[in-house]
Amino acid sequence: MELTVTQTTPDQLIERSNRLGADPRTTNYAGGNTSAKGEAIDPVTSQPTTLMWVKGSGGDLGTLTESGLAVLRLDRMRALVDVYPGVEREDEMVAAFDHCLFGTGGAAPSIDTAMHGLVDADHVDHLHPDSGIAIATSADGEVLTSTIFGDRVVWVPWRRPGFQLGLDIAEIKRANPQAIGCILGGHGITAWGDTSDECEANSLDIIRTAEAYITEHGKADPFGAVVDGNEPLPEAERRARAAALAPVIRGLASTDLRMVGHFTDSDVVLDFVAREKLQPLAALGTSCPDHFLRTKVSPMVLDLPGTASAEEMVTRLRELHAEYRTAYAAYYERNASPDSPAMRGADPAIVLVPGVGMFSFGKDKQTARVAGEFYVNAINVMRGAEALSTYAPIDESEKFRIEYWALEEAKLARLPKPKPLATKVALVTGSASGIGKAIATRLAAEGACVVIADLGLDRAQAAAAEIGGADVAVGVQVDVSDEDAVQSMVDAAALAFGGLDIVVNNAGMSLSKPLLETTVEDWDRQHDVMAKGSFLVSRAAAKVLIEQALGGDIVYISSKNSVFAGPNNIAYSATKADQAHQVRLLAAELGEHGIKVNGINPDGVVQGSGIFAGGWGASRA
């Protein structure tokens, strides 16, 4: 094995990783890992030393940078073979990798480090492509591997990731010098090469060959026929139904731990939830460790047709949720040992609704979105396996060993402490500028997902992008005096993040005129925006908060003018007094649902404000 002496080695590795990670057909978010071996000068001895650069624990191939690489001395890493205590204690080897690190900084080595270091090849890729996992989870995967690839790709029976799997693959590489890689049963693929380009080409060869074989030889309808009544609802009806269901489902999914939601109604999802094999395949659960660590072992599936009413769906979802929790607790009890970590929660991470789509949940928007993406990967895997054979994921006990793995628990324990408003969803009206934008910015900084609602869509979207992008903030257009527009705004919040927790009534305007110059039109316009608008927003939001059953907060940005009188602003001050009394009324009414209603009475805020339409801001500055 010839090794190169230059910075080119890690540079090429990063470029290869980014290309592979950019294609969802190749690997999923934060899944898989890549490596390269080469030489560098030891700064202590000034002698060349053989190193391995490998993607570190928790990194994502698509966005990998040099800081995300773990760098190990290859001789020390391979010397661990001599002290390996056996498969029953292989978890101890992860800590041993730290004693093989070269230099300072860099990422922590992952559980797959041994696979890369022990295989006798300069470059190694371990990936989770849909087509490769489809072969890996087929009941006759070993036969299919031989049929599709001949002796170029070798079958490796399922083994949990770790040091022993690295030894197994290294031996397979030695015994099969003609092979370019292997299919890992129930898991994914590994490929290798003498150069970075050759390794990447071999990875893509395995993936594309599997894709082509599935397309050419697979059954046309591997999920069976479309069930009558489960066809996708028309788009507008489907989105409205999803918005109505999302808060209910989010509340159920947050029984143990509050979650943020994500909704997906892609063609892949809608086709799967419409088919006759939906229930039996979903019950089998996912197989690839990266999949079920994000999605849990199986989803919750509504067993009603898409044509059922919203009320029927809600009633049945509540029943199914109770059943799911009982089943998950039983799964934990069946498989747990005295040393197992405590159960992390019995609620579903994925909920499938025929005719509507998929709801996914996580500790933040990104986690919820990625869980949904992983389940789409799982659907593709099931389709490929069923097209060629029968989908056969790894055993339940093996899934549990990974889901409640001590190493996985340790990784979770190392996560930073969540911010105060993590898992909360906030909606702020009039938040593209002024007080509203400042509030939205602070809420996001404290960990909340934020809906920026404003009369101008472009301004709302620009503010959302400035605050943090789609996994943190979304911009929506709303005229708070329009009942339908307000409902659309609340629906958008439900579709974006699953529901609401904090609602800030901030939208406003000011017409500063003496009594005798104030027209009926002025009065009506002022009250439409602030008094009526606050009422409409609070009413629509309260419905969501009550359905979620998670409590919540409604905050009114009123004004000192609601209390103190002054000349030349009767319309504005009267609406502020209206808002102040709405606070008192709603606090009394909504408290039984755990919903707190409060008001803030600030003085004039001019900087960055867009509410002053009549020159009042300039006169008060």
Language-model regions: role of each:
Residues K543, A588-E589:
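Alpha-helical segment proximal to the catalytic Tyr-Lys
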